[in-house]
Regions:
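Transmembrane-helix motifs of polytopic, lipid-linked glycan transferases
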Residues: 17, 88-109, 124, 148
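Membrane-interface alpha helices of multi-pass inner-membrane proteins
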Residues: 164-179, 186-191, 303-311
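Extracytoplasmic
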Residues: 181, 226-227, 357-522
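Hydrophobic, aromatic-rich transmembrane alpha-helices
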Residues: 3, 99, 264-295, 300-305
Length: 524
């Protein structure tokens, strides 16, 4: 009996170990690191949501859904370093997603050993700091949790439990609500269900997703004082439009640059998937009953649809990394069929090839990563945990390392409890660092607002005169519209320069420099 229990749970135990030794190990070292702009935006959303809701106010209707930030906003009710807390939450969700995906590949491949080799390799790639930075950079791994769980449940569907498609639909909808661009995965799943099971089962999937999706949207609308439901979706495209001028200039360049970065990181997995695809088609031509071509096309679609996101907005390497789960599914299918139809000697050679290729593919990047000073810590878990309570962001030695921290320290000294702040040029991280909030969603990023006003200085002057943020830090980044912001601020007649964040090549985020302006009428 004990032997059967151990064998039954062996895969789960190994999945947990693989997740901890790859995802956990790579991420935990970076948790105490300095603030960065991507995570700063999500952290600001959490800050704002908590501030509004805890004060009994409604969320401004023009704020995006940002469900991940909303459900984690409770950290602002605790006397801790919220940056660190949110990174810990992101790590825990990434561990959960890693375990679930291991189980998906184990089921798809039918091999525990194959899963250990391939999933370990892909997790080392996907959790490299260059893609995830320091945690809570975006909602990708949070959305993976319901999506991978839906995949795992779908692999265990039989004629007696078709009711589970309601649950699968709900999980898929949750994944989309957490990260809106993943609606492409949702649509892919819907098409796959239709082809595999017919329209009656598809209806169950759609009903499940509708129940959870519309219920969640209903509460989100209530939190926004019953605003127009279309505003929630419009706000997502608002954010895309604020990058529109950059996308027009850099869309093609970014696509090729960052796709090549992703290919270089996972070239060995692409090779596995390519040969697996050829092998599956070879078997299909021999006898269609030998393989499930529908299943292959499902995994292929999962590998390709993330590319669509990079074609409609400015794409980066971490967007292309979302192709990896689909590629891994193709490789797992190929191994399962090879295990069924090939001789033992062939399987041994193929497995040896996979191991050698995985090591040669992962080793160069992982060795460079592990040679970074951040991985010299002897007690990374306790160090990251202690930063929850004793943050080094307020220590002068740490402040000197980052222009974000330098700017935040200056702004805090120049403000009081009731002050507000406006920034420009990827500086939203300053809101949670200073504890200040913008006067509105529009003034959260003045460059984005300026763009949406078609660079109309008069309109922006009127908005600043009407809303009067206490402090403005426009930064001097090389972005369209930034050079004209200082002129706009001066035209209001309301502000004076009170500090300068100097450019220094020896600090992190050195481009976050420039003048800090404050209302002339400010009273300390």
């Amino acid at each position: 009996m004990l032997t059967n229990i151990n064998h039954k749970h062996l895969g789960t135990i190994i999945a947990i170990l693989v997740a901890i030794l790859t995802t956990g190990y790579l991420r935990v070292h970076w948790i105490p690191f300095l603030p960065e702009p991507d995570g700063g935006l999500y952290t600001h959303y959490s800050q704002y949501f908590f501030s509004a809701l805890s004060s009994g106010e409604f969320i401004a209707s023009n704020y995006p859904i940002a469900l991940y930030s909303l459900v984690t906003s409770w950290v602002y009710g605790l006397e801790i370093n919220q940056f660190i807390a949110l990174r810990w939450i992101d790590l825990c969700l990434a561990l959960t997603a890693s375990i679930l995906f291991f189980k998906v590949i184990e089921k798809e491949s039918g091999s525990l050993f194959f899963s250990v080799v391939t999933v370990s390799a892909l997790l080392l790639v996907m959790n490299n700091y260059s893609f995830i930075l320091f945690g809570f950079r975006n909602s990708i791994w949070a959305a993976y949790v319901p999506l991978f769980l839906a995949l795992l449940i779908s692999q265990n569907i039989n004629n007696k439990n078709h009711f589970l498609f309601y649950f699968i639909g709900a999980l898929a909808a949750l994944g989309v609500l957490i990260r809106e661009p993943f609606i492409l995965f949702y649509i892919t799943a819907a098409i796959a269900i239709w082809f595999a099971y017919g329209w009656k089962i598809l209806v169950k999937y759609l009903i499940g997703s509708a129940i959870l999706g519309f219920t969640t949207l209903f509460f989100l609308i209530i939190l926004r004082e019953g605003s127009n439901p279309l505003m929630l979706f419009k706000n997502y495209f608002y954010h895309i439009n604020t990058m529109g001028d950059l996308a027009d200039e850099q869309l093609v360049t970014n696509f090729f640059k960052h796709s090549l970065i992703a290919i270089k990181a996972y070239w060995f997995g692409i090779v596995f998937s390519f040969f697996s695809g050829i092998y599956i088609f070879k078997l299909s031509l021999k006898d269609k009953k030998l393989v499930s071509t529908n299943r292959f096309f499902f995994w292929l679609a999962l590998a390709l649809v993330p590319i669509i996101e990079t074609l409609i907005k400015l794409g980066f390497d971490y967007h292309f990394i979302n192709c990896i789960p689909g590629l891994a599914g193709i490789a797992a299918m190929g191994w399962r069929y090879a295990s069924q139809y090939e001789f033992s000697i062939v399987k041994k050679y193929v497995l040896g090839f996979i191991i050698i290729l995985s090591i040669s593919g992962v080793y160069p990047n992982i060795s460079r990563t592990l040679n970074l000073n951040v991985y010299d810590k002897k007690t990374p878990v306790s160090d990251a945990y202690n930063q929850l309570w004793d943050s080094n962001y307020s220590e002068i030695e740490t402040i000197r390392l980052s222009n974000y921290l330098i700017a935040a320290d200056m702004i805090k000294k120049l403000s009081n409890r009731g002050s507000t702040l406006a920034t420009a040029g990827f500086a939203e991280v300053l809101y949670p660092l200073t504890g200040l909030l913008p006067t509105s969603y529009g003034t959260m990023d003045l460059r984005a607002l300026f763009l949406l006003l078609n660079w109309d200085e008069d309109k922006l002057v009127n908005i600043l005169q009407e809303q009067r943020p206490t402090l403005i830090f426009p930064t001097k980044q090389q972005l369209p519209g930034i050079p004209n912001l200082i002129r706009v601020i001066q035209r209001t007649g309301l502000y004076e320069r009170v500090a300068i964040v100097s450019y220094s090549p020896n600090v992190y985020y050195k481009s976050i420099s420039g003048d800090i302006f404050r209302l002339k009428s400010f009273n300390q």
